């Protein structure tokens, strides 16, 4: 079913959900059906290559998912889907042109992701003492990976756009600890996403503050390897964060040209993200003279 039809059908179900229910069981079934449908919309969107279509449809989808969370606020799968959706919209379509709005979107993603983490059993991630926080991470297992990874990813995205806030930066050690736990549990999870995060972190941190460019390179290359070269955003970030920092124009251009030479649908479920990677790669190449 096309994305726009899925959204239209989901809209009708949202209306039903929010009307006073004569039968509690009926409402529960409708909520469950809509939650499943919204996940289907997300999956269908990630197979799209039409960035304009997805960009224009996302605000409606986000409003729908907000309505669903309002109806079933303790559904952890719905919460994590909402977090992923807000973070993906911010990073893929908004961040490069409107950082203030992207920060607002990431704040929503962070809120949903932390709520999902709590519903999954990890209580008070913001306020519990750090030693207790780390002990809690050690109790998390493979089954907890989606909640752990996406909470850390959304939280980290919010911090990256909020670096002027000392309070936000003080939360970074918690995110790093979460990503390190992801690496311990399964370094290949989400195309080596934790390695990608650590690569960006090491490359972005000044050497005087402990950043290690060689370690950043190792993390980026491991992420690319674990994604079998199909997750093109890993290569875009490698060029943007490592090659630029290393002042290696040849590597910068070669990496981005490799991205553009790889079909977006090399992995169907990554078509949208790879199309975004193509767009970002073209922009970075056009701006190369500004960096080197």
Model regions and ranges:
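Membrane-interfacial loop-to-helix junctions in multi-pass transporters
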Residues: 187-188
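A short, ordered amphipathic alpha-helix with a cationic face
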Residues: 5, 20, 53-55
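Extracytoplasmic and endomembrane cell-envelope/extracellular-matrix remodeling and assembly machinery
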Residues: 286-292
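Bacterial N-terminal signal peptides
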Residues: 10-20
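Domain-scale activation on soluble regions of proteins
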Residues: 227-228, 285
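Short coil/linker segments at helix-helix boundaries
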Residues: 36-67, 71-74, 78, 85-184, ...
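Bacterial N-terminal signal peptides that target proteins for export
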Residues: 2-11
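Bacterial Sec signal peptide processing site at the extreme N-terminus
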Residues: 19-45
